[in-house]
Amino acid sequence: MAKTAADVLVESLIQWGVDTIFGIPGDGINGVMESLRTHQEQIRFIQVRHEESAALMACAWAKYTGKLGVCLATSGPGGIHLLNGLYDAKMDGASVLAITGMPFHDLTDTFTQQDVALDRLFMDVAVYSTRVMGPEHVENVAEIACRTAVAYHKVTHISFPTDIQDMKVSRKTASKRNVEGHTSLVHARSGQLPDESDLRRAAEILNTGNKIAILAGQGALHATAALLAVAEKLNAPIVKALLGKAAVPDDSPFTTGGIGLLGTKPSQDALETCDTLLMVGTSFPYIEFLPRTGKARAVQIDLDPIKIGLRYDVEVGLVGDSRRTLEALLPMLTNKQDRSFLDKAQKEMQVWQELLKKRFSNMDKPMKPQVIAHELGKRLRADTIVSCDSGTNTTWWARHIPAQRGQMFSCSGTLATMACGLPYTIAAQIAYPQRQCIAFVGDGGFTMLMGELATAVKYKLPIVIVIIKNDTLGQIKWEQMVFLGNPEFAVELQPIDFVKFAEACGATGIRIDDPKECGALLDRALAAAISGPVVIEAVVDPLEAPMPAKVTFDQATKFAESLLRGEPDRGKIVS
């Protein structure tokens, strides 16, 4: 029996190792849905409640597994809804393929129902976006879309007219140049190493440095051993960009933790005072936290040549896989005898840890968000995957939930979209059924895509969702005050009873509002997850500010201005 065009697409995905697709059915994509039904023993379809979630799940799938993430939506509004999640994938370098429906091929661009030229709409978010022109076209574009997404860690897109999906594929109607079997499914993984002369130039810079700091990002997640070996040889503290949180365990004596507004003071001091910087797999966007231009000699390792020199004036760019490049560089490095720079960073970390301890040990009510983050961090298994949403909760996640060896952590690092935490966690749990998967979210971000709790219940996922409930868009509130000097405005949220919401969806809900009971209730929640999703409503102090590691004079001035100009919580904040 002849295959349909949709069958060719689905079987191409299977051959590329795709076994999971996230999405929502619709009349514009039902031909592909029928093929997924007939192939469901080889590829599973995860039905979500909003297409944005499908794209975020595909992004998280790619991040956590290293495989191609795939999302699917119908024509028009379905495809449009994918965009936010796809931009998250684009900006964090995740390999994602989006498949969307279209109207009948001979009615496109005629103002018919759901007639949106998604192939053109997706041209910015996707490096390859195409429209299927006929059933014999599918095999070619599917191969290119999969290969491009995987090879370049980018987003690709195929838009599929609804009538062509059901058409039979026939070699008789193929063009003479579309020779059968001319495509290949072989994926040549990059084995790229920098030129040896560049490696030696990089080694010369690192060997002559006196105060060397390493900045590690997402591209170093698989290079932990090599990263630590280089740090030990150079006596260099390792500073971690947000997406590089798991690149080095936080109990390593070489790391000073994160950098930026969510980072640590020792990390900021290390970058401010270093004379040599080694950047590994990062395009950390907050340039103001890097060494002043001209202060440090720099070497950068990145798989993408476009990222070399993007954030800092590096002397040597090493294009290649971070682990293999570090391993090639290691024999060229000399053992540093002077430990003073590293020792200083380690002593500062001890002081920083004492400061954190003071904050997470505070038993006052309302409960401080640092308490729930710290107590959760103590209870995570060695195989835990923690996905964080965007907001003040990101600060507590970054500083108070330490990364242990074997754990995974991720968030929307560059787009910093709200609502990603729950979809990320669902994807992680589906990818790794035996691992503990936690969502650490704020009430603002959670409510944007809270319908996905029903998805977690439907698929009986043992996830735990920790909601930091402060009834406010906290990050925006403090940005208004500290960065602009304005009183808060339009940031209060209507309170929601998340325990009742969880129960209405068929999940377990647990409220924590007393810091003295926090640990025991967390134990109960984590144990209850064996039966399905658990929602923890952690009621916290809305006036606990996610302050930068080092407050600048301008920030302090702006904060004072906001109080003087009518900040409604001025009395409580001052007291």
Pin down the residues of each PLM region:
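Phosphate/pyrophosphate-binding active-site segments
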Residues: E136, K172, H182-L185, R189, ...
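Active-site diphosphate/adenylate-binding microenvironment
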Residues: L9-V10, I14, D27, V32-R37, ...
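Thiamine diphosphate
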Residues: I99, L107-Q114, L261, G309-R311, ...
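Acidic active-site catalytic centers that drive phospho-/nucleotidyl reactions
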Residues: E51, D275, D302, D389, ...
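N-terminal alpha/beta PP-like core and its mobile active-site loop of ThDP/TPP-dependent enzymes
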Residues: M1-Q337, R379-A382, T455, P462-I467, ...
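Charged, low-complexity, helix-prone segments enriched in Lys/Glu/Asp/Gln
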Residues: W61, I80, S340-S361, A428, ...
